[in-house]
Amino acid sequence: MKGKILFALFLSAGVIACQPASQAAKQQEVKVAKAETKTKKKESKAEKFRKALAAQDKWQKACSNPVQIAPEGVDVAQFIKEMKATIKYPEDGNVVGDWRKGESLALLKKEYKALYGKKGGSKKGNCYACHCGDPRIIACGNIGPSLRGYGNKGIDPKMTYERIYNPWSQVPCSTMFRFGYHGLLTPEEIADIVAYLHDPESPINK
């Protein structure tokens, strides 16, 4: 009997001693699984972006000649008509959303942090890679036209929306990303960026 009690005590001690190691192993497994999931999500987003830009539909093929101004062998009026037909609008029909959300989409995380000292920003728009806009952001691109004071130029917000959704609906073979056409931005996100460009309270127009 005494031997059985001692055996039970030793067994209990062994189980207790093993628990922390077992829990640590499980925690490590959870961490690894989370890290792998995060990596897969990043890869899937990057892959989606690469596929979108490399998609060779008939229009992309027509614009693949780097020295041409208009699509080769295509009626320009028909080209623009078909590009306009691809444009989808927000469910509520409003092409002007929330400029603050638009600003967060337009700025990279590091740009947002530098301006406001808190988390925000996104890789989705990255507008300042090609444009200047907010005068506080000095490191900006010049591939596209300046966006400073954009809301004071009398441009129809719907035209701005369409230009972002599918630039080829206005300028065939434009080098600007077709954000909506390729699904890089949702209609609602594009509406928020339109607000960022047009709203009088936006830093773009200050």
From Swiss-Prot:
Heme c binds at residues 127, 130-131. The keyword Transport applies. Residues 97-201 form the Cytochrome c domain. It comes from the Bacteria. It is found in: Cell membrane. A lipid is attached at residue 18 (S-diacylglycerol cysteine). It is a lipid-anchor. Keywords: Cell membrane, Coiled coil, Electron transport, Heme, Iron, Lipoprotein, Membrane, Metal-binding, Palmitate, Signal, Transport. The keyword Signal applies. Residues 21-58 form a coiled coil. One of its GO terms (cellular component) is plasma membrane. Residues 1-17 form the signal peptide. A lipid is attached at residue 18 (N-palmitoyl cysteine). GO terms for molecular function: electron transfer activity; heme binding; metal ion binding. Gene3D superfamilies: Cytochrome c-like domain. This is Uncharacterized lipoprotein aq_1806.
